[in-house]
Amino acid sequence: MSEDSPPPDSPQPPTIAVDAMGGDHAPAEIVAGAIAAAADHGMSIVLTGRPSQLRPLLAADRGGGDIRVAPADELVAMDEGALASWRRPRSSVAVACQLVRRGQAAAVVSAGSTAGIVATARLRLRSLPGLLRPGLAVALPTGPKPTLLVDAGAIADPKPEMMVQFAHLGVAYAQVAYGVEDPRVGLLTIGAEPAKGNKLARRAHELLAAAPHGGQPIRFTGNIEGSDLLAGKVDVVVTDGFTGNVALKTIEGAGGFATELTRAALQGSQAARFGTLFQRRALRELAGRMDSETYGGAALLGLEGTVVIAHGDSKAKGIASACRLAADLARGHITERIRERLGPSHRAGHFLRRQ
């Protein structure tokens, strides 16, 4: 691939580098999702992976979309962690990141191992100057403008200062993706009072309340509890990656549980079936909003490039949604927005030395 990807604000669609070998259903469903994204959203796609496996799948494409293949001989398996990213410089996700670094693609999409993607992206794309750690942001289904959860699993045990930066990442995302002019930021903990929570949460609350730290202001509204995650009270929820990932998986499980309850009710008594039929549409919409195939995945923010991590069991619909999200973030100059939000104090390293 010789030509560079157009700038994000170009009338041409951005080029998305898709890791075709990452995910439980790779490469068939990944390729199908890429074909759908190219056909439905007019974007250019570069699939990274083994040409011998990808070209036969592309041969069935009758849509005529702009899809190319960049050879990658290695892959990071779903059960492998961060070390695999060092051992396999020619993995499909590493090649995708290199395309972005060289300006030949605007964003990366992968459904591979989260730990492997985060490690590879940090190694190949590098963090923005002054950023302590990148954060994983995912949209929660709270209505027309979702609530963003940051961090959803990139850093399990962050420092409090990192959580202030997570707030900046989430604010930039909300502004770019959902047009929220002045996003409200809440800290996820076990009570609304500032003194509630563990040592990490209490210190993070102090720092968020005192922000900005050389960057742009944060509209911090205080603590929120788990019961408020889907209430739409804030636009950005800040937490550590361990808590955030548990919360996200719980919400996903609740969506599946609602679907199973509906199925069970439809097989119950006549009265139960009659009542459920009236609620079926609403329940279907609720389950759809909580479906990982719909929201497109999580954005790994704070790097010199856009990375979207799709759910590991994503099929074609989920991959197409992830490609659309990646294109939207690239068009909205998400990297530059974050760079502006961090401000000179972060870039100068005054906020906290990198750990």
List each model region and its residues:
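N-terminal phosphate-binding or glycine-rich loops at protein starts, especially the Walker A/P-loop
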Residues: 2-55
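Short, glycine-rich nucleotide/cofactor-binding loops
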Residues: 16-28, 154-164, 309-315
